[in-house]
């Protein structure tokens, strides 16, 4: 899908939770291009004992210039920050044959790219890289290129968050 769309976070029970560790419904949806398998599908050859679902998305954060309006003189704000998220979940079990089903998976999101400004100045003081290889560096978390900040050359490029989710199917 393409665009801004409200989505329920993976494995979230709306009766028990306000959100997950990686994503929640408490913020405006991020405009994105997203490829997904939203519901579990059976893996061929497993006699319906193994199912998978997941997604891969890239987008951009928007704030209707809120940061520019809110930032006090001399303070920093960032524009044109990019977004990446991905998930992969497996469900093992077959309710018709055995009463217990388990699901497990990984969910990750990252912020990267963008330009940092000082309130009152037109030119950015820092531009984070966002070429094709930077999209790959976020997809498969790896260190940044030579034009990334030093900390992101040593560690991973972008601000990554993620969670492993394991539990019985409710």
Located regions from the model:
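Short loop/turn motifs that connect adjacent beta-strands in outer-membrane beta-barrel proteins
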Residues: 40-54, 91-103
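Long, internal scaffold/assembly segments composed of regular secondary structure
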Residues: 102-104, 112-170
